[in-house]
């Protein structure tokens, strides 16, 4: 039974792409294959999009809008189901990497008994495939009761954060206060979605955005990477301040 103290109830919610792993374009290639198969020539509808921080459902909507194709949920569901199958092939390609400091950090958090989850724009199986490629999927729980938010929870990233908080509350048996969650991400969209719910954000400059850009976006704390971040995150779990906050 979880302790009722705030510190023991704290939860760290990780983004996936650009935060934990770099998938070397596997997701973009997989979705491109599916869109071509379903819709024919898509020209530059996908290549012209900045996907950082977008949910998979929003990416599909944006591509369909660019092509002048009507959006409907059934089509989106079908495209994303096919995308997962294509991703199984693409994720094994070259260039994939687990970002520096991630595996030892997750190992330290697991050994400490920390509660961690995912807050990602990926569909759940897409996230699992990416983390499994890097051998780090076992650090997270999967299934309907896992503390997580995924693309199936909504197009808007704010809804994904809300879903993760709600599942955290269900798991803990009482409401998870936003200040007792910490989103770790690498894009301004991660920041704005979390802040919309009052959740503090640790941003890491391991994706496309610099430390300055992430700080300007409103991140509570910013680090160059997750390398060496374990002590600061353990301190936050024990009731301390958000890692990466300027002294």
Tell where the protein language model's regions lie, with residue ranges:
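Non-catalytic pre-domain segments flanking phosphatase-related domains
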Residues: 1-14, 62, 71, 180, ...
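Active-site neighborhood of HAD-like aspartate-dependent phosphohydrolases
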Residues: 2-48, 52, 58-66
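Short, acidic loop-to-helix structural element flanking the phosphoryl-transfer center
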Residues: 13, 88-118
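Membrane-embedded alpha-helical bundles of multi-pass transporters/translocases
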Residues: 35, 83-84
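Helix-loop "lid/cap" segments that line or gate small-molecule binding pockets
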Residues: 57-71, 164-167
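Substrate-recognition "cap/lid" segment bordering the active-site pocket of phosphatases
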Residues: 123-182, 188-197
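Short acidic-hydrophobic, aromatic-tinged amphipathic segments that line or gate anion-handling sites
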Residues: 149, 221-226
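Acidic, Mg2+-coordinating phosphoryl-transfer loop and its flanking beta/alpha structural elements
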Residues: 183-221
């Amino acid at each position: 039974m979880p302790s009722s103290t705030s510190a023991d109830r704290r939860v760290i919610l990780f983004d996936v792409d650009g935060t934990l792993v770099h998938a070397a374009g596997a997701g973009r290639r997989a979705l491109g294959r599916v869109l071509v198969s379903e819709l024919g020539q898509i020209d530059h509808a996908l290549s012209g999009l900045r996907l950082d921080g977008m949910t998979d459902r929003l990416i599909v909507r944006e591509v369909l809008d660019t092509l002048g194709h009507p959006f409907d949920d059934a089509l989106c569901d079908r495209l994303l189901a096919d995308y997962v199958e294509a991703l199984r092939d693409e994720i094994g390609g070259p260039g994939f990497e687990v970002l520096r400091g991630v595996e030892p950090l997750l190992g330290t958090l697991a050994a400490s008994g920390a509660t961690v989850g995912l807050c990602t724009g990926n569909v759940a199986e897409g996230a699992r495939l990416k983390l499994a490629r890097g051998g780090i999927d076992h650090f997270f729980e999967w299934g309907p009761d896992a503390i997580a938010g995924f693309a199936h929870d909504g197009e808007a990233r704010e809804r994904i954060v809300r879903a993760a908080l709600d599942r955290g509350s269900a798991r803990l048996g009482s409401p998870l206060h936003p200040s007792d969650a910490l989103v770790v991400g690498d894009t301004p969209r991660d920041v704005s979605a979390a802040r919309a719910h009052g959740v503090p954000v640790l941003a890491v400059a391991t994706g496309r955005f610099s430390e300055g850009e992430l700080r300007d976006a409103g991140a509570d704390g910013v680090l160059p990477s997750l390398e060496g971040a374990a002590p600061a995150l353990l301190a936050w779990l024990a009731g301390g301040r958000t890692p990466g906050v300027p002294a």
